[in-house]
């Protein structure tokens, strides 16, 4: 049996989980999310504890058991606490600011880079060098953070660019030259 799949999920207060056809709907104080439930799996909700159960031991069902439980856990945490990713900007003259709902960045190009946040994502800028991406959908928060980082990924010589706050940039030595 899948070790991740058989683990129970304790629901926080004000969070509801119900199965509708091929989806699991999760409602909470921050919003509503749904994740697909694969054939051969079912959701059992008892007294605020959710368990995923398999109807058979097919290899595909066993493989999807842990995945579905992890996706469901991400939805539960998202609607109760939310997800966030922090980015940092390094480099002389590099900065970010909010203009309406858009994120406007000066990243050393001849033009400003404008990023429009998708629905359900909130972007905050602190001190012009720190960007915080928040939302209830873990996948979407990570994708938005990756899109922003891709506008100017950190380079390996001085580390200039946009990086995740917890990311370590391995630096290279520059040219040594003749002596």
From Swiss-Prot:
Keyword Cytoplasm attributed: no
Source superkingdom: Bacteria
HAMAP family: Ribosomal_uL6_B (MF_01365_B)
UniProtKB keywords: Ribonucleoprotein, Ribosomal protein, RNA-binding, rRNA-binding
Gene Ontology biological process terms from the UniProt entry: cytoplasmic translation
GO molecular function, one term: structural constituent of ribosome
Subunit note: Part of the 50S ribosomal subunit.
Coiled coil: none
Classification via PROSITE patterns: RIBOSOMAL_L6_1
Its biological purpose: This protein binds to the 23S rRNA, and is important in its secondary structure. It is located near the subunit interface in the base of the L7/L12 stalk, and near the tRNA binding site of the peptidyltransferase center.
Annotated GO CC locations: cytosolic large ribosomal subunit
Protein name: Large ribosomal subunit protein uL6
